Structure formats: structure tokens, C-alpha cells
């Protein structure tokens, strides 16, 4: 993979075999690059021309990278992480027929119960006739616990989490060498 930034003469080659460190001494350039990467990782426009390439294919930074701006306050319950976690749980639920059938049975019972209550009210209602597993997980408030971890444990936990959930192809830390 290649990281191409307009203000740089050379491309940055990214490999699974080693960690790449990019040091930018010029503060104005540093700010522009960080803002550009951050914007692109959150599907916003950037003033900087920054590309992530896999061979000849241009990758979407918002989908294929994860940018950590503040390493001291890593949010393990970021929407991107939780959506991937919910998707992973959903896959496991649908792979096990017994769990899937039991869950569907509970859905039917809950809908019947809510229907009986709604019929007693003098209003007309509309609602989703089906609840997907992700909706149930969000309703249940499933979150990742990471309290009481040291700085290094949080970093390693994040790397493990990204690897297990196959969250992204490139993990980008800002100013991690400062710690």
C-alpha cells in the first residue's frame, strides 16, 4: 500500500511487516496534513491532496483507515468500531440456527405484547415490523469496556480490536512518539 501526500516528494510505502513513522518538522505543514487526514477519515473535504493506494486502486480513507488524533483519550465505543462489532455479533447469531430461532421467537413475543398495548390506545401507529440484530444490540447498549488500562495497554487493545474486527487496513496515530 502507498500513502501519497501532495506536499511530499516521495510516497510513503505501508507494509504489514513494519511500522512507518512520519515526522513533520514544519508546524504549518504538520497542521495541514493532520487536518487533511482527519477530514478524509471522516468523509469530509480536505485542502490537502492525500491518497491511500493499494496497487493501482485508490482506497477510501474513511473506510480503510482509522485515525487516532488523541492517543490519551481513545474512544473504543466510536461509531465505526461499534458498527463493526454489531456486524460481527450479527454474523455469529445468524451462523447458529438455535440462537437465531430463539431470538426470532422472542421478537414475535415482544411484538405481540406491544401490539396488544397499542390496540388499546385510540391512536394509529406505525412501526418497524422487523427488528434486526443491530437494533437490538444498540437498544441493549452494548459497549466495550476498557477502564483502568495503562496507555500502552490501550494502544495494544486498540490494535487487537482493529485486527479482530477487521476494521481497517491502516491505523494512523498522531503524535504517538511524544509519549
Residue ranges and their predicted role:
Residues 67-72, 100-103, 117:
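A general structural signal for short secondary-structure boundary/capping elements
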Residues 82-91, 96-115:
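Extended, H/D-rich, highly charged conserved domains that either
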Amino acid at each position: 500500500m502507498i500513502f501519497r501526500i501532495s506536499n511530499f516528494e516521495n510516497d510513503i510505502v505501508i507494509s504489514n511487516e513494519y511500522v512507518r513513522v512520519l515526522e513533520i518538522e514544519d508546524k504549518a505543514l504538520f497542521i495541514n496534513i493532520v487536518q487533511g487526514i482527519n477530514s478524509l477519515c471522516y468523509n469530509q473535504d480536505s485542502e490537502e491532496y492525500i491518497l491511500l493506494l493499494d496497487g493501482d486502486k485508490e482506497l477510501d480513507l474513511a473506510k480503510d483507515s482509522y485515525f487516532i488524533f488523541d492517543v490519551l483519550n481513545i474512544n473504543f465505543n466510536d461509531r465505526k468500531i461499534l458498527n463493526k462489532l454489531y456486524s460481527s455479533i450479527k454474523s455469529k447469531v445468524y451462523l447458529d440456527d438455535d440462537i437465531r430461532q430463539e431470538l426470532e421467537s422472542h421478537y414475535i413475543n415482544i411484538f405481540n405484547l406491544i401490539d396488544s398495548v397499542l390496540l388499546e390506545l385510540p391512536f394509529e401507529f406505525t412501526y418497524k415490523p422487523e427488528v434486526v440484530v443491530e437494533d437490538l444490540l444498540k437498544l441493549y447498549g452494548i459497549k466495550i469496556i476498557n477502564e483502568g488500562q495503562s496507555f500502552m495497554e490501550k494502544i495494544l487493545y486498540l490494535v487487537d480490536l482493529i485486527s479482530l474486527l477487521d476494521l481497517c487496513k491502516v491505523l494512523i496515530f498522531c503524535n504517538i512518539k511524544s509519549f
